[in-house]
């Protein structure tokens, strides 16, 4: 399989991820915080060490790491909690995933929300002066920004946006599903209140383990409830972190894989991995641009992109193109990629695009297979 679907989930994983998960399940496999026996204690230590690794990776030793099964659940916990605390003027980027927009839409059926899109100009630059004016006109309570679009890879200047937002004491949330472990971001800065991450994407870990980073002095009302292994006589969720938001048994085998992947990333270097991915993105763009029947969507010069490219093929729907690529043993993602707002901005709604996404593991052999498929399409248009 020539794999160009890394924005959905990265593949392959570093070999150490497979080995660590196998070893964990065969030799430990305990439940964290659920006993004093050696298996449980060893697993609890692993969970604690993985939190420290995430703090190291994201430069936030003073902030709390909370594990969840998915980034979508993490975003729900944060967004629903912040709104319950009173946020009403909510700014989002034009490129948010349904994990954000559907959550806000669901809340808006029960609460009066003023949802405003941050200004991005036609050349795909966040207009900071216009955003400053937006905030002056309607002061923000809550600002949510996808660090990189999962449709075309544009990286947002989140620090600059959040500096503006903090003048109004807004709560800030960055969705790092497409960037954690790939784009260096100092979450230790005061402007970052919350950040969601997806372990199975740019963090190169397994599916089923994600979470968020938060300032420890912010209290969100929990939206999910259950056992935590602590304060079991108390029928309210504990006030202590991270237990307040970690209900049920943690995916400890997933955490073991994430621990291994983060160690691998730290050893190789975040900047090195980004540079390698950017080189692969340039190779992908060069290949696609050889064919005049392909239209690249949402691209411009600059290095503020992760390894995602969206395109259209003249005369072929994105769905049909996906079937052609699949029949040629190529993995891509077609349609709206769970981000209809981005496609409305790019004027590719409702059909969507063909999305290719590369990373450091994308090989020359993958590009050779893709070229053969593009030649097939060229010969049969």
Give, region by region, the residue ranges found by the protein language model.
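Pyridoxal 5′-phosphate
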Residues: 1-381
């Amino acid at each position: 399989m020539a794999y160009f679907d890394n924005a959905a989930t990265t593949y392959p994983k570093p070999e150490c991820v497979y080995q660590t998960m196998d070893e964990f399940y065969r030799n430990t496999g305990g439940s964290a915080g659920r006993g004093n026996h050696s298996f449980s204690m060893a697993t609890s230590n692993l969970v604690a060490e993985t939190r420290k690794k995430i703090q190291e990776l994201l430069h936030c030793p003073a902030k709390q790491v909370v594990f969840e099964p998915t980034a979508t659940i993490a975003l729900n916990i944060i967004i629903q909690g912040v709104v319950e605390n009173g946020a009403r003027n909510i700014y989002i980027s034009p490129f948010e995933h349904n994990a954000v927009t559907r959550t806000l839409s669901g809340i808006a059926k029960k609460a009066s929300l003023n949802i405003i899109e941050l200004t991005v100009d036609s050349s795909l630059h966040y207009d900071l002066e216009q955003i400053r004016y937006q905030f002056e006109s309607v002061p923000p309570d809550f600002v949510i920004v996808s660090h990189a679009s999962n449709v075309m890879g544009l990286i947002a200047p989140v620090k600059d946006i959040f500096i503006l937002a903090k003048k109004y004491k807004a709560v800030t949330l960055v969705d790092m599903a497409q960037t954690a472990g790939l784009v260096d971001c100092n979450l230790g800065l005061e402007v970052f209140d919350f950040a969601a991450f997806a372990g199975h994407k740019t963090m190169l870990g397994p599916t089923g383990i994600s979470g968020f980073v938060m300032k420890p002095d912010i209290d969100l009302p929990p939206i999910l409830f259950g056992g935590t292994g602590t304060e079991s006589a108390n029928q309210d969720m504990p006030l202590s972190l991270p237990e307040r938001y970690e209900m049920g048994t943690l995916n400890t085998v997933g955490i073991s894989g994430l621990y291994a992947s983060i160690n691998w990333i730290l050893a190789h270097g975040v900047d090195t991995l980004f540079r390698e991915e950017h080189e692969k993105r340039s190779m992908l763009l060069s290949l696609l641009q050889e064919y005049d029947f392909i239209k690249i969507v949402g691209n411009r010069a600059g290095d503020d992109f992760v390894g995602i490219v969206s395109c259209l093929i003249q005369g072929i729907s994105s769905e049909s193109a996906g079937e052609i690529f699949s029949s040629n043993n190529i993995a891509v993602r077609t349609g709206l990629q769970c981000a209809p707002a981005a496609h409305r901005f790019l004027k590719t709604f409702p059909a969507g695009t063909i999305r290719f996404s590369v990373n450091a593991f994308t090989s020359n052999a993958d590009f050779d297979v893709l070229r053969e498929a593009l030649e097939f399409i060229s010969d049969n248009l």
